[in-house]
Amino acid sequence: MKRLMLLGTAVAVGLALSAAPTLAQRKITLNVITAGDQNMVDYVKDYLAPQFEKDHPDVTVKAVGTGPGDAGSQKIYEKLVAEKSNAEWDIDVAVIHQKAAGLMVNEQLLAAYVKDVSTGKFVSSAAASNSLGTDVKGYVIPMFNSQTAIAYNSDMVKQVPGTYDDLVKWVDANPNKFGYNGIKGGMSGVSFVVGWIYAYAPDADKLMKGPYDAGVKNSWDPAFAKLKDFNKKVVLTPGNAGTLDMLGRGEIAMGPVWVDMFYTWQADGKLPPSVKLKLIGPGMPGQPMYYVVPAKAANAKVAEQFIELATSPKVQAEGIVKKFNWYPGIDATAVKAQLDEATWNKLFVDVTPQDLSTKGKSFPIAPYFNDIQEGYEKKVQ
């Protein structure tokens, strides 16, 4: 309501004064809401916002985080649903996970903005068209792509597991030295659980590609039973950052992490050089996060300009790859041209392009994804 009153006042002043400022000179607060860990908020607030505000002195970027994992994106979804009947919505730009993107597109909560931004031509990934089985083409641009892997302290782990089977044997011999966050507090634990189901349940390919068959989940009981037994010998950490923190302090020797967070923590001195990465077979999921514009964003055009900056090859190179250690969200060839070879190659020290090609998986289509998370809560926790 406050936004509408402010807009009304601005219009009234414009009518009253023949030499009034243009709409472009009106002071605007661009509300950018992001799910994910604190590094997501830091990226918007400390990196993107100053650049955008420098080129748009009439705009103040306000960055707010809603928390890690799908729960963070769910809060954004609930906010949009609550405002659905309003003429304008408070959120101008949102950064969300795949699961929420499909839901929001299906419920007509997002604008099909990609055709209207100049950087739309750099959108090339399959995940920009299909999000866990839902057609999202035209509604999303990936902010980045990321991957989970197993981080391990090479001073403590001499025989590094190469597969889930190897990991189970290692944990049997080294109880309470592996840690993960279950399915709470972040997606690194969720990814580990999904990778477990891919390893020990039949037909992982069907889970990723569909079609959905509600009866398939009944075939996962042995995999969940095996995971429940596994969990008796591991440490449950507080979340994505919690796993990294325990690795850094030597409280655990191994655990699943996001590759980007791992490299950032290591660059900041919070992880010793002895901690390294291994993408184990048969594979673990990664995912993008998406820039979206809500269907009734109050500042939709400014939101599009903000996303154009954020998805430009220069910003993707300097911010996404060099500063925050993500894989680029737009076409990698456009980004690589902006970087020196050493910076580009740093992304692939432990997890190679070949690893990503053979063991980097997608998350399941949404209904199977829901079934896995519900199955974990009922049969593992």
List each language-model region with its residue ranges:
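Conserved C-terminal helix/tail region of periplasmic/extracytoplasmic solute-binding proteins
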Residues: 350-381
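Periplasmic-binding protein-like
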Residues: 146, 221-228, 271-292
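Extracytoplasmic ligand-binding site segments that recognize negatively charged/polar headgroups
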Residues: 35-45, 66, 70-71, 90, ...
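Paired acidic/hydrophobic, glycine-rich loop segments that form the ligand-binding mouth/hinge
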Residues: 88, 92-95, 236, 253-258
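Mature extracytoplasmic/periplasmic domains
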Residues: 284-285, 289, 293-356
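Sec/Tat signal peptide C-region and signal peptidase I cleavage site
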Residues: 18-24
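Early extracytoplasmic/lumenal segment of secretory-pathway proteins
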Residues: 26-98, 102
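A ligand-binding cleft/hinge motif common to bilobed small-molecule-binding domains
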Residues: 101-103, 256-273
